[in-house]
């Protein structure tokens, strides 16, 4: 049997709850309308114009004929698994069939998103680029890749990679120690 005072208290609480919910909903709808009406109008802008200068003025390395009619921009992180898959399975064919035939040039842009090893590897590649060995260093970095954030781009390994492509080690080491390309590397993500 139901206790009459309990039923009355329950009915009152239920009624109060329903009234509070209705007022809350009406109030929030009213506030949403106010927010929508008071939002400032923003002039729509198109996308920023991207030109070849966007890619080459910061010293991004170019592979192939600079006057090739097609430009392929490789955005890469030397620790990136999918970047490595691209290098291992597709890039060599693109180079063979399109870059070496003068149809395409490739521009490399650092896109370091994974970790400190990415930045260290990019420094190594830019320092190798001073000796016109960027693409050789790029290739060895991807060939020796062992995973993300596991230390494969340690100073010792990066030095061994530079030695293996016959870089002038005094110049390369001086460049690395000076972190000469830090700004270019960090700005590449913008």
Residue ranges and their predicted role:
Residues 1-113, 183-190:
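Extracytoplasmic thiol/disulfide redox context detector
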């Amino acid at each position: 049997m139901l206790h009459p005072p309990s039923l009355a208290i329950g009915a009152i609480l239920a009624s109060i709850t329903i009234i509070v919910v209705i007022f809350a909903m009406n109030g929030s709808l009213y506030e949403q309308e106010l927010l929508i009406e008071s939002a400032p109008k923003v002039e729509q802008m198109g996308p920023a114009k991207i030109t070849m200068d966007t890619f080459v003025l910061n010293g991004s390395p170019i592979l192939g004929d600079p006057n090739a009619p097609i430009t392929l921009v490789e955005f890469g992180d030397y620790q990136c698994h999918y970047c490595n898959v691209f290098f291992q399975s597709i890039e060599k064919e693109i180079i063979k069939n399109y870059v070496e035939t003068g149809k395409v040039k490739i521009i490399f842009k650092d896109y370091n998103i994974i970790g400190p090893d990415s930045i260290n590897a990019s420094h190594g590649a830019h320092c190798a680029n001073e000796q016109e060995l960027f693409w050789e260093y790029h290739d060895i970095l991807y060939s020796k890749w062992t995973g993300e954030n596991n230390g494969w781009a340690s100073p010792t390994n990066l030095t061994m990679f530079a030695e293996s492509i016959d870089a002038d080690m005094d110049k390369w080491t001086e460049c690395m120690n000076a972190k000469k390309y830090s700004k270019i590397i960090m700005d590449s993500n913008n």
